[in-house]
């Protein structure tokens, strides 16, 4: 979750390995993140590039304006496809519109901005319409959690009827409260399947996890559960529940839910994998240290210590002020930066909102809790640690995570570095989903004995 704090602390010393159209590192990385969903039909390269070239460099309002135009246009395509009965085309257009709506609202500075919430709701609406035309069964789930619920999607390996004869054509893309676009299912298999549980990190939403987890899992013979926890997506937007460092308190209820649904969902409880993406690499490691039912863990990427990462990107005078407890000076410094730099303003406001903190100083010092230093030896399940060669969010930390897995035999842990030559040097290997998924799932297949 502290990824972007680290980025802003390096605003004047950026040396990112890739600049895509934009010189602004935030715009470049977010564009790549959006384009990366092309692999699973969540984007089209030409649409993304045409949108990007219309955006004014470093202008957050221009970013929103141009992406929302593209999203609305593709959304209208999807509606027309539904009206004409072109359901495959509608599926693809809804997926792209969902991604573009998410991208449009991403950089809106004020969390209370109604455009932010509207863009996310439209992203979710388009995704719901897309999954109604998938050839496999997907259902929304509600995971009981401390008197409330965590939202999720369960993607069944079980295949739906692959013809569209059971779908009633309608011109209305909003299927809320309607079963008109749900196909009848084939008779469920009696087999139980390995299942991948995926959560994001600092800024992803539930629907984005389809491309980054569910789609490759289904292709390789895995069920998949994606969910949002405290500080993420709807849980922070609607329930106002901030991040928590003790993520096992989140994952244990998820495993309880899985156990309660194991027969209905054809889940092999002896083969359940947890994967955390981006800052989720910290969260998943924390959960794996304390939840014994995790069969294997994927840290995508590894995070050793959030506070150390922040300090490594700050000038000495500011580190000294933080460690001396000079909150007034620290807050004043960041307040000045927020007035002059929209990147700083966005990241600080988003960080304080999702963590429930009230000042930059409180946000930064709160990162001390987000450390795996003293818990890695508690992890007993096979663990895969990923790293981008030139990812400067947590430089050198994934290797420390791997080396800290002292309770695991060499055969039960693996550390993979994605190189610039491969195109995978960016944070979370953004832009190379093919090789990333190949390495993740080949390792999981070997660990779990799955044949994909």
Question: PLM features: residue spans?
Answer:
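N-terminal cap/lid segment of alpha/beta-hydrolase-fold proteins
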Residues: 67, 121-187
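Short substrate-entry loop that stabilizes the transition state in hydrolases
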Residues: 162-165, 188-193, 198-218, 233-234
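Catalytic active-site module of serine/aspartate enzymes centered on a nucleophile-bearing elbow/loop
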Residues: 429-452
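Conserved alpha/beta-hydrolase "acid-adjacent" motif
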Residues: 392-398
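Short beta-strand/loop motif that positions the catalytic acidic residue
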Residues: 379, 385-387
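Catalytic histidine neighborhood in serine/cysteine hydrolases
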Residues: 405-424
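Alpha/beta-hydrolase active-site loop
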Residues: 242-264
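Primarily recognizes the serine-hydrolase "nucleophile elbow" in alpha/beta-hydrolase
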Residues: 102, 269-317
């Amino acid at each position: 979750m502290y990824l972007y704090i680290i980025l802003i602390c390096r605003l004047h010393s950026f040396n990112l390995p890739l600049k895509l159209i934009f010189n602004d590192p935030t715009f470049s990385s977010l564009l790549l993140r959006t384009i990366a969903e092309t692999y699973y039909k969540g984007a089209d390269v030409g649409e993304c590039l045409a949108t990007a070239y219309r955006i004014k460099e470093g202008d957050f309002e221009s970013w929103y304006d141009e992406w929302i135009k593209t999203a609305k246009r593709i959304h209208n395509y999807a509606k027309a496809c539904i009206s004409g009965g072109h359901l495959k085309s509608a599926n693809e257009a809804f997926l792209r519109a969902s991604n573009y709506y998410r991208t449009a609202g991403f950089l809106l500075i004020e969390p209370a901005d109604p455009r932010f919430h509207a863009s996310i709701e439209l992203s979710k609406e388009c995704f719901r319409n897309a999954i109604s035309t998938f050839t496999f069964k997907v259902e929304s789930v509600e995971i009981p959690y401390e008197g409330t619920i965590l939202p999720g999607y369960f993607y069944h390996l079980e295949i739906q009827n692959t013809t569209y004869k059971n779908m009633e054509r309608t011109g209305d893309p909003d299927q809320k409260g309607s079963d008109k676009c749900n196909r009848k299912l084939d008779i469920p298999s009696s087999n139980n399947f390995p299942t991948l549980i995926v959560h994001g990190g600092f800024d992803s939403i539930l629907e984005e996890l389809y491309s980054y987890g569910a789609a490759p899992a289904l292709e390789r013979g895995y069920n998949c559960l994606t969910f949002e926890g405290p500080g993420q997506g709807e849980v922070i937007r609607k329930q106002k529940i901030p991040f928590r460092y003790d993520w096992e308190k989140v994952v244990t209820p998820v495993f309880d839910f899985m156990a309660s649904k194991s027969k209905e969902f054809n889940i092999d409880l002896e083969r359940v994998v947890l994967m955390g993406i981006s800052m989720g690499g910290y969260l998943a490691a924390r959960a794996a240290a304390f939840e014994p039912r995790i069969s294997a863990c994927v840290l995508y990427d590894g995070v050793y210590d959030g506070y150390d990462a922040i300090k490594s990107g700050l000038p000495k005078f500011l580190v000294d002020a933080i460690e001396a407890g000079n909150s007034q000076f620290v807050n004043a410094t960041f307040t000045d930066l927020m007035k002059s730099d929209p990147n700083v303003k966005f990241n600080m406001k988003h960080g304080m909102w999702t963590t429930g903190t009230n000042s930059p100083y409180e946000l930064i010092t709160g990162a001390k809790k987000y450390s795996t230093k003293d818990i890695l030896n508690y992890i007993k399940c096979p663990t895969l640690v990923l790293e981008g060669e030139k990812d400067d969010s947590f430089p050198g930390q994934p290797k420390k995570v791997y080396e800290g897995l002292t309770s695991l035999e060499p055969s039960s842990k693996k550390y993979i570095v994605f190189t610039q030559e491969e195109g995978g040097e960016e944070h979370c290997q953004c832009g190379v989903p093919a090789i990333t998924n190949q390495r993740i799932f080949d390792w999981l297949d070997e660990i779990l004995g799955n044949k994909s």
